[in-house]
């Protein structure tokens, strides 16, 4: 099997450790930083870092390429193994004993160009700016208006990221939906809304505000169009992986009080 290993810039040592182990059984055809430019074509991409590193690596992958993450960050929702579990991973790889998750991207079109996001796209005011009036138009429906600091459009993958911190719901990764979450809205009853993923969303602000794609500032714009992309990646998990266990252990959600 031809494998690419991509690592967070500060985790080259850990990347070399995995390369040494994996190369005993498989051909490592690429070894480099996850944030380096270019596309990666391999049978499997191994990522060393946290969720941010996985997000960067996913955009370099060819459609449908399986990916597996080794945790070297904080929460690690998108990582599946620890470095200490490398032998367990190699055993799972020999037998292809994985659970697979399909994680799809959203496509964002604006005057800044076209972008892909696995988590979310955010339009928000500057720290020094005032609240903004934002119009959100969902395909086949009339507009919604928010007077807020901004708005986040997220995938199910991104529901445990920025959207969650501003009151959005946790969405299981198998769901085919998009989430629209206003940031610090003026009216208390303004809450997140979940829509079908095949609906296009147009967001327009009364003035230029910051656009962030998967947390990375890309510039200022007034208007974006968001829709589900055809691009996707496959995340490999250990066979016993359980999403509820993950959100309970990492977020404390649904934890039983003894």
Swiss-Prot record:
* EC number(s) on file: 2.7.1.23
Q: State the InterPro entries in the record.
A: ATP-NAD_kinase_N, ATP-NAD_kinase_PpnK-typ_C, NAD/diacylglycerol_kinase_sf, NADK
Binding-site residues, NAD(+) = 51-52, 56, 119-120, 130, 149, 160-165, 184
Instruction: List UniProt keywords, sorted A-Z.
Output: ATP-binding, Cytoplasm, Kinase, NAD, NADP, Nucleotide-binding, Transferase
Subcellular localization: Cytoplasm
List, alphabetically, the GO terms of the cellular component aspect.
cytoplasm
Family designation: Belongs to the NAD kinase family.
**Per its record, how is this protein called by name?**
NAD kinase
Q: Which organism is it from?
A: Thermotoga sp. (strain RQ2)
Q: Gene for this protein?
A: nadK
């Amino acid at each position: 099997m031809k494998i690419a290993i991509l690592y967070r810039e500060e985790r080259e040592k850990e990347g070399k450790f995995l390369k040494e182990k994996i190369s005993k059984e498989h051909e490592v055809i690429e070894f480099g930083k996850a944030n380096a430019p270019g596309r990666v074509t391999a049978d499997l991409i191994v990522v060393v870092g946290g969720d941010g590193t996985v997000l960067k690596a996913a955009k370099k992958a060819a459609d449908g390429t399986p990916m597996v993450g080794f945790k070297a960050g904080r929460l690690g929702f998108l990582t599946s193994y620890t470095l200490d579990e490398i032998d367990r991973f190699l055993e799972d790889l020999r037998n292809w004993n994985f659970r697979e998750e399909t994680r799809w991207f959203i496509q964002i079109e604006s005057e800044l160009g076209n972008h892909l996001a696995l988590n979310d796209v955010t339009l928000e005011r500057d720290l020094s700016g005032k609240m903004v009036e934002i119009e959100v138009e969902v395909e086949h429906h009339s507009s919604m208006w928010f007077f807020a600091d901004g708005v986040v459009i997220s995938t199910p993958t991104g529901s445990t990221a920025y959207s969650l911190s501003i009151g959005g719901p946790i969405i299981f990764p198998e769901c085919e939906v998009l989430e629209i979450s206003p940031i610090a809205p003026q009216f208390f009853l303004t809450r997140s809304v979940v829509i079908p993923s095949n609906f296009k969303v147009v967001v327009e602000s009364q003035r230029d505000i910051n656009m962030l794609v998967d947390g990375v500032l890309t510039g200022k714009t007034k208007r974006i169009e968001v829709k589900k992309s055809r691009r996707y990646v496959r995340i490999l998990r250990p066979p016993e992986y359980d999403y509820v266990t993950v959100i309970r252990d990492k977020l404390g959600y649904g934890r039983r009080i003894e």
